[in-house]
Amino acid sequence: MLRHLAARQAKESDPARDAEPGKIMHETRRGEMAATGEVPFGLYYGSVDATPLFVMLAAAHLERTGDRALARELWPHVEAALSWMERYGDRDGDGFLEYGRRTAEGLANQGWKDSWDSVFHADGSLAKGPIALVEVQAYAHAAWLGGARIARALGRRTCAEALEARAEALRRRFDEAFWCPGIGTYALALDGEKKACRVRSSNAGHVLLTGIAPAERAARVAATLLEPRSFCGWGVRTIAEGEARYNPMSYHNGSVWPHDNGLIALGLSLHGLRKPLVRLLGGLFDAALWTDMKRLPELFCGFPRLPGQGPTAYPVACLPQAWASASAFAVLGALLGVTFRPDQRQIRFVRPVLPPWLEMVRIENLRLGGASVDLVMHRHEGDEVSLRVLRRRGRIEVAVIN
């Protein structure tokens, strides 16, 4: 995947495709309209988050595998992506990443919620760009730090220190610009005039994933996400009930997306917020039980959960869908708090938690380098979790950190 994205990284500016040097693609299509150029999506770059996410993935792969050879191979592409963030992504020099389409044919909104009406103010008026999405700033923070870790692993100390300084500068500015005490969470976005879109959204949950939010803010964001207006019983809605454009049957303004919830779960785990994490997992697990073949769909409607009834299907949701499928592993990883230390040949389970209805988890062939391990984890009274190694192949250590 990293090589695939790197091979398609933009090398020149092309307004028709929203392409700029170093930018990572948003999507590629092979239909007739794309092939004839009627729509710009043959190879389209109108996504403000794909580029920092690419850097995050490259850093995560290095930390997971210790593969410095691949990191060295990808480094020119990581450098180009970071350069795009600085030169093109930050449109006005304020340190935040913003977007705005360059032609009328491009996407009006270029975050993961790319519906035309997905970014708005509390009164329902659409935000005018360039728009700085809240979650994208968190991704940028993680990308600067991830790039720094790659640079340091490759012996580029001066570069690493410069990237760390950029991450710290963004962290200092972020909270002041985005925090909205009146709604108990971060703003959905800043518009082109730097006015906050004071809307309760799932986007704010992604902020927990990268460490840009202080601990006290993370706890407050989690509480807001798990309020009935946001948490429908099956998962966190994209937009909270009561917001101006809330519609539980809409694509991005009140529905529930498993991948969205998976990222929130990882953030909750990072901050040690175990109770909301277990509650979130319970909703998604129950939703899967009601779905055909026990799969999580791309999304479902955000109507409140009722006794004896499953979630309301979104009629044209993909099933299966890659994002949704990955969310199951994200949530499991969040529960178990699994991290990898290739340099120490160690797998760690940090503050693992299992919900009351899940007594045991068995994992086979969990790999680290050329070694692997089979293990089982049990839940005990008092929410304690124990671990037992069943089989070990090669040199590998397993540790539980509570």
Where are these regions (language model features)?
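Beta-rich accessory regions
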Residues: I150-A177, P181, L268-R279, Q344, ...
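Catalytic cores of secreted or luminal carbohydrate-active enzymes
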Residues: Y314-R362
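Active-site-proximal binding-pocket segments
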Residues: S255-N261, G272-L281, A288-L296
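Substrate-binding cleft of carbohydrate-active enzyme catalytic domains
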Residues: M1-A7, K11, T36-D92, L126-L145, ...
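Well-ordered alpha-helical scaffold segments within catalytic/enzyme domains
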Residues: L53-L70, W84, V136-R157, H206-R217, ...
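Active-site-proximal structural scaffolding
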Residues: S47-A50, A71, V78, L133, ...
